[in-house]
Amino acid sequence: MKRHTGRYTVITGASSGIGYETAKAFAGRGSDLILAARRGDRLEALRREILSSRPALDIVVKAVDISVPGNALQFYEEIREYPLQTWINNAGFGNYDAVGHQNLDKIRQMLRLNVEALTIFSSLFVRDFQDTEGAQLINISSAGGYTIVPAAVSYCASKFYVSSFTEGLARELKESGCRMRAKVFAPAATETEFGKVANDAVEYDYETAFGTYLTSAQAAGFLLELYDSDKVVGLVDRESFSFQLTEAQFHYAGDAKHNQNSSREIN
């Protein structure tokens, strides 16, 4: 097995869309990659595409469904000995339906992927690499992680979790003096397989549905801008589709007088 001494970037959900383009973008910068997704054939195709122009890179592909309980932990254990520097939690999907009509099996799987797997990976990556120079955790949220979108309440709730969790983690890391940085990327409508999955549709036309939208390559470019910046949030405006690099958006009760006193013994 080829294993380099450089630092690796892990990208989940790398078989299509933003994850696919982000993998190519990081490879373009000379980063070795560990790519995870359900569809191993697409990962292998991506690996071949990258190596055709960057043959010196180490591109590790792992076919895994991280929405299945236990698979996220197993995947992490398989790669934890690699010298990791960047982890991008991109895997996720959405759902368009009224809460009272939504398919609960689909919602359960969505929460396992959007929330549970992301939290497991974030926690373990921070635990093992928080003092690694240059380490970054980038969690993919959504513009719907800062604004509630009609007919997408459950999806937005899952992305509000991603946004608030990552913003809070970013504060924890900074206040603890850790070298790692945590960031949130929140794109607006992007032409990917998201539309078909969210609507349980065989075909989905972004031109008809939205009129204005990002390409996956544009979104990956914005993600790189966030990676290069010292800001916590990279947010695409849902109306103008302009990209903003900002500080954390949620209120943080760090100095609230009614916070739990951490110096007290808790029984």
Model-derived features: where do they sit?
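C-terminal helical subdomain
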Residues: V184-A186, D200-H251
